[in-house]
A protein has these predicted regions:
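Acidic, serine/threonine-rich low-complexity disordered tracts
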Residues: 24-125, 169-266
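Sec/Tat signal peptide C-region and signal peptidase I cleavage site
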Residues: 19-23
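Alpha-helical structural elements
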Residues: 11, 27, 35, 150-152, ...
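Bacterial N-terminal signal peptides
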Residues: 8-16
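Bacterial N-terminal signal peptides that target proteins for export
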Residues: 1-8
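Active-site/ligand-binding surface loops and adjacent short beta/alpha elements
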Residues: 126-185
Length: 266
């Protein structure tokens, strides 16, 4: 083959390969910084029953991860009182992301009901795609351990929260979606980030916030079956503070409502 033609084809290959493989999923972070600390009141909802359930927190710190600067985001959910006696939730979720908000490591230690599980997902970025090593231990027994390769940007539970805080919703209308990939257990699934419009939300710090309403829906590979995963109310400003976060459990949902926030970026 003519050398000039070969070089031209290589150029096209580099330019037009999927963004997930070559662009490596880099995002400019404009919404949070080292030292952000948000505390929440938790509410358990099952059917028509809603009860105060405990406390939660979302903390962000800048740390050293394998010799490089990284964001460490830690979410704690701890139920107590009557709701806690009905269905216990004591979860610790930790995510490490590089300075471009690419997930590096995610761990979840969860006591939910009478069960204990531990999940670990580690991400590596190579020329031929993204490798995700994932494993889960459930009640002391290993359920799976495998490595998945993908060419699209893929997020865990906490890095997806960092993602939606930095998306631009300016030109979106209610019903609009952004499609991403999400790691769920041993599978990479399709996820839609749904824009549901604007709303005023009163938080437990006594303030009323203008918020952007977001929900995230997980689809199967054929986009036929779906389930709601997370929904959030984010402040309609540069900080995109999660004022309310709804997380779906095996039974019911846990709602986190902002109680206090400090260390804001903007």
């Amino acid at each position: 083959m003519n050398k000039t033609i070969l070089l031209f084809l290589l150029f096209l290959l580099v330019v037009f390969l999927p963004q997930g493989a070559i662009g490596q999923c880099k995002i400019i972070n404009n919404s949070f910084k080292d030292g952000e600390n948000i505390t929440y009141d938790l509410y358990f909802n099952y059917g028509i029953v809603t009860a105060k359930a405990g406390t939660g927190s979302l903390k962000t710190n800048l740390v050293n991860y394998k010799g490089n600067s990284a964001f460490n985001i830690r979410m704690l959910l701890n139920t107590s009182g009557l709701a806690g006696s009905v269905y216990t939730v004591n979860d610790t979720l930790v995510s490490y992301m590089d300075m471009n908000l690419r997930p590096l490591l995610f761990t979840k230690n969860a006591f939910e009901g009478k069960d204990y599980s531990r999940e670990v997902q580690s991400f590596s970025y190579v020329e031929d795609g993204i490798k995700v090593r994932t494993n889960r231990v459930f009640n002391g027994k290993k359920k799976f351990e495998e490595t998945i390769t993908t060419h699209e940007c893929t997020y865990d539970y906490l890095s997806v929260l960092a993602l939606i805080r930095n998306l631009d919703y300016t030109d979106m209308e209610p019903g609009d979606q952004k499609q991403i990939q999400f790691i769920s257990g041993r599978e990479i699934v399709n996820m839609a980030v749904n824009y549901n419009g604007l709303s005023k939300i009163k938080a437990n710090d006594g303030q009323t916030y203008n918020t952007v309403q977001i929900s995230m829906t997980i689809y199967d590979k054929a986009f036929k079956d779906k389930k709601e995963a997370i929904s959030a109310s984010l402040t309609d400003d540069a900080n995109r503070i999660p004022i309310v976060i709804d997380t779906h459990l095996k039974i019911g949902t846990i709602r986190a409502v902002l109680k206090n926030v400090s260390g804001l970026r903007n």
